């Protein structure tokens, strides 16, 4: 099937937070909302068909999770990432952010320290702080527009932490970590008894010939220290259905995690996410294979447009995710001036860079 990603869809009346929250977030509805990882494309037709079939049943009671659900995850992992995690080591959760919050609540105490690499997805700050943990930053180092790990700083700071939250691939920089970096970070965590939680939600969205490596696959020793968080909700634009899969290194941790959610009676997919997620894994690849070059062409357009028309803004073209990190420092604006400029002059609603790294000035995503 040929998909039309050029189709413009009016989302102003479909209860989209991306559009409906413009006034609250930007003080005006007169902006193009580009502030959340949410595409404006219809999802794959097999997913739509699965949801239509479920809707037509007319009964949406408590939902079971058939064995085929996690088997679909397993088959995707084996086919595209070269590993075959046991389905018995998988747990459902509402989302990757909720998974990270739960794991920190289960395995750390208030006041414990959590390591993050900035600039990074703002929830990596917000969730630990909301539950009383202390965030420790290992700032990524920028050199000539590329970013890398400061390992001396990483090794020093990880010693005082209980958890390392890894963004793999990295949001907002679009970094596809190579195996050597992943191995080095993971070994340092292992040597210091630090749990490594790997957020890999953007791993299906890879460009420019890069290849994603699951952190847990580097070695058997590293596997035993890594909790892997995956989901196809970003991949197929299904975030509103709330579903992710957590892959544990052992059954003990899975049992701890399942017990935590069961204590709140939160352990079932909703009726539509159950069928939609399985359809995505089993029948969505054709759509994804057409999406990726379309997104890559969008990146080319952004790069060429900025170079030609606004050279003061330098886009960091990502190798992963569909998000672009903008270096606006040459505009010479404060963070507040830059925010106002984007809203009032450019008429676009973006994320301020300082929410990804609190000491940063002059960046947007």
Feature names for model-found ranges:
Residues 131, 191-192, 222, 346:
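Helix C-cap/helix->beta junction micro-motif
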Residues 278, 294-303, 315-328:
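Conserved glycine-rich beta-strand-loop-beta hairpin in the small C-terminal domain of fold type I
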Residues 200:
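Walker B catalytic acidic pair
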Residues 49, 220-296, 304, 308:
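Conserved core segment of the aminotransferase class I/II
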Residues 313-314, 326-365:
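Conserved C-terminal alpha-helix-loop-beta "cap" of PLP-dependent enzymes
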Residues 86-87, 317-322, 361:
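Short Gly/Ser/Thr- and Asp/Glu-enriched loop/turn motifs at secondary-structure junctions
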Residues 60-187, 204-205, 212-221:
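Conserved core of the PLP fold type I
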Residues 2-95, 102, 280-283:
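N-terminal small-domain helix-loop-helix segment of the aminotransferase-like
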């Amino acid at each position: 099937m040929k998909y039309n990603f050029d189709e413009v869809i009016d989302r102003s009346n479909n209860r989209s937070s991306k559009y409906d929250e413009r006034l609250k977030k930007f003080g005006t509805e007169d902006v193009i909302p580009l502030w959340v990882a949410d595409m404006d494309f219809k999802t794959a037709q097999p997913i739509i068909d699965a949801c239509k079939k479920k809707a037509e049943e007319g009964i949406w009671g408590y939902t079971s999770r058939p064995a085929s659900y996690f088997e679909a995850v397993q088959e995707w992992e084996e086919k595209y990432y070269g590993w075959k995690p046991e389905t018995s080591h998988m747990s459902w959760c509402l989302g990757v952010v909720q998974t990270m919050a739960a794991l920190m609540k289960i395995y750390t105490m208030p006041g414990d320290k959590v390591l993050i690499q900035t600039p990074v997805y703002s929830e990596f700050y917000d969730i630990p702080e909301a539950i009383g943990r202390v965030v420790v930053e290992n700032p990524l180092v920028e050199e000539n527009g590329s970013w890398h790990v400061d390992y001396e700083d990483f090794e020093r700071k990880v010693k005082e932490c209980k958890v390392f939250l890894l963004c793999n691939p990295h949001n907002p920089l679009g970094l596809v970590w190579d195996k050597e970096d992943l191995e080095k970070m993971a070994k340092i965590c292992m040597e210091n008894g630090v749990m490594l939680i790997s957020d890999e939600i953007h791993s299906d969205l890879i460009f420019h010939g890069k290849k994603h490596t699951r952190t847990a696959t580097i070695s058997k020793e590293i596997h035993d220290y890594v909790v892997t968080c995956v989901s196809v909700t970003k991949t197929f634009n299904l975030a509103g259905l709330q579903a992710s899969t957590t892959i544990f290194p052992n059954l003990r941790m899975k049992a701890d995690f399942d017990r935590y959610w069961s204590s709140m009676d939160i352990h079932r997919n909703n009726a539509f996410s159950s069928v939609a997620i399985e359809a995505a894994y089993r029948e969505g690849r054709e759509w994804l294979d057409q999406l990726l070059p379309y997104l890559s062409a969008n990146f080319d357009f952004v790069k060429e447009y900025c170079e030609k028309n606004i050279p003061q803004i330098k886009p960091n073209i990502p190798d992963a995710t569909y998000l672009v990190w903008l270096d606006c420092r040459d505009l010479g604006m404060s963070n507040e001036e830059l925010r106002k400029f984007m809203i009032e002059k450019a008429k676009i609603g973006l994320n301020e860079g300082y929410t990804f790294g609190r000491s940063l000035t002059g960046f947007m995503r």
